[in-house]
């Protein structure tokens, strides 16, 4: 099963400094049919204006993965962590028993990012934060695991979830196959370009919910960049 979610149909919020598209119910956007996909609870497509951002605010019991598409983001939290991540970088914040943090675009141009919230495998984990650079040349033509709750993914940022976050950059004409397995769920979003999954064409910003399929075949119709979360049984 492939469920297409066009960019134009996503939830939308205009805060002036923040333009946000919501793949799932979030804040004032609510759709009873769009609560989660597997363990994916939130997927926000954000554009943050220069010298603006999110002030200190709390989170609890959620694995929050930030994928920078353009620009950069500066993070600070109640654990004493400070960091700046830019395009090609990934940040993971495990909220666990509770964390307070801020995120600002301190740059001269817009920052574009995906922020993905994944439900943890249990509540009460110790909060933590980490980031890592994943040069796009390292995942050209193939999926690279960016964050994962599985011990075999030793190069990925760790999360406390039955899930993995994958990224790939594709040249026009590239085809990659991924063994999803029927009992697992996938949620894929196009960060750049145009791709086809079987007979489903996705453009920049579009998404596909994947379920009950053994293997997915992805073809790049032009140079493309994609992000996918694979999770266990639907929660």
Curated annotation (Swiss-Prot):
EC nos: 1.13.11.24
GO molecular function terms attached to this record: metal ion binding; quercetin 2,3-dioxygenase activity
Catalytic activity from the UniProt record: quercetin + O2 = 2-(3,4-dihydroxybenzoyloxy)-4,6-dihydroxybenzoate + CO
Pfam families according to UniProt: Pirin, Pirin_C_2
Entry keyword set: Dioxygenase, Metal-binding, Oxidoreductase
Positions bound to a divalent metal cation: 57, 59, 101, 103
Keyword Metal-binding: yes
Cofactor note: Binds 1 divalent metal cation.
InterPro entries per UniProt: Pirin (IPR012093), Pirin_N_dom (IPR003829), Quercetinase_C (IPR041602), RmlC-like_jellyroll (IPR014710), RmlC_Cupin_sf (IPR011051)
Pathway this chain belongs to: Flavonoid metabolism; quercetin degradation
Function per UniProt: Putative quercetin 2,3-dioxygenase.
Family: Belongs to the pirin family.
Protein name as it appears in the record: Putative quercetin 2,3-dioxygenase ZMO1337
């Amino acid at each position: 099963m492939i469920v297409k979610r066009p960019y134009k149909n996503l939830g939308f919020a205009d805060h002036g400094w923040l333009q946000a598209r919501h793949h799932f119910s979030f804040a004032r956007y609510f759709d009873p049919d769009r609560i989660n996909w597997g363990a994916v609870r939130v997927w926000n497509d954000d554009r943050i204006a220069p010298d603006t951002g999110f002030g200190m605010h709390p989170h609890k019991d959620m694995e929050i993965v930030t994928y920078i598409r353009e620009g950069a983001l500066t993070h600070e939290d109640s654990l004493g962590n400070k960091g700046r991540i830019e395009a090609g970088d990934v940040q993971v914040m495990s909220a666990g028993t509770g964390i307070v943090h801020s995120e600002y675009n301190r740059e001269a141009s817009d920052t574009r990012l995906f922020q993905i919230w994944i439900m943890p495998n249990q509540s009460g984990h110790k909060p933590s934060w980490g980031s890592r650079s994943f040069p796009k040349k390292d995942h050209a033509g193939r999926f690279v695991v960016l964050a994962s709750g599985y011990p075999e993914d030793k190069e990925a940022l760790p999360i406390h979830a039955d899930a993995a976050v994958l990224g790939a950059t594709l040249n026009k004409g590239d085809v990659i196959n991924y063994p999803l397995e029927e009992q697992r769920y996938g949620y894929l979003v196009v960060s750049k370009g145009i791709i086809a999954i079987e007979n489903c064409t996705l453009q920049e910003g579009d998404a596909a919910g994947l379920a009950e399929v053994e293997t997915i075949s992805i073809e790049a119709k032009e140079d493309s960049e994609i992000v996918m979360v694979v999770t266990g049984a639907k929660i």
